[in-house]
Amino acid sequence: QVGMIHTAMNEFGKQHDGYSQAPMSVCSAMSQGYIGYDLQNGIRAELIKRGIYKPVSTVLTQVTVDPYDEAFYTPVKVIGRVMTKEEADAEEAKGNHVTEVEGGYRRIVASPHPVAIVEIDAIKALMDADQIVIACGGGGIPVMEQGYNLRGASAIIEKDLATGLLA
């Protein structure tokens, strides 16, 4: 989903002046939001249908990663659509990594290990309040600490690793 959103946002930006391309971390947040929204409403409806009245909450979840994680030097996570050789060359010219796949080329990004879940206290508070919590969607929004700020990382965190950290 993130690759699809990233491609769509960037294609739109290319075709319309005044619109900038969306960073990978923003696309991760969009993916988390729309999937979380659908899950939250689906779970809520099913609970009500069964006579269970329990709040369901989706938490946009940022997950810190180490900026020196080896994964940033050897990207392997395939995202986006299949491209032609010319499109792949253009991606590489922009500083992105691509790999050859059946039928063409695809973009690859880093898949660093998750370090910490930024919103863990909010997630725990919602669970303590007996809510059903949807968190770490898509592996979380990868961020790096930069002073007092969090900066989005151009990466995708493996869902299993983020969920393991959440557990």
Predicted regions and their residues:
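A short secondary-structure junction signal
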Residues: 69-72, 144-148
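Short, conserved beta-strand edge motifs with alternating hydrophobic and charged residues
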Residues: 59, 133-137, 142-144
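Gly/Ser/Thr-rich active-site loops/lids in small-molecule metabolic enzymes
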Residues: 125, 149-167
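A sequence-level detector of short, solvent-exposed, charge-rich linear segments
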Residues: 24, 77, 141-146, 153
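Short secondary-structure transition/capping segments
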Residues: 6-8, 147
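Ligand-binding beta-strand-loop-alpha-helix segment within the catalytic cores
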Residues: 10-133
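Generic, ordered loop/turn and secondary-structure boundary motif
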Residues: 106-110, 118-119, 142-145, 151, ...
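Short, active-site-adjacent cap segments at secondary-structure transitions
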Residues: 1-5, 65-67, 141-143
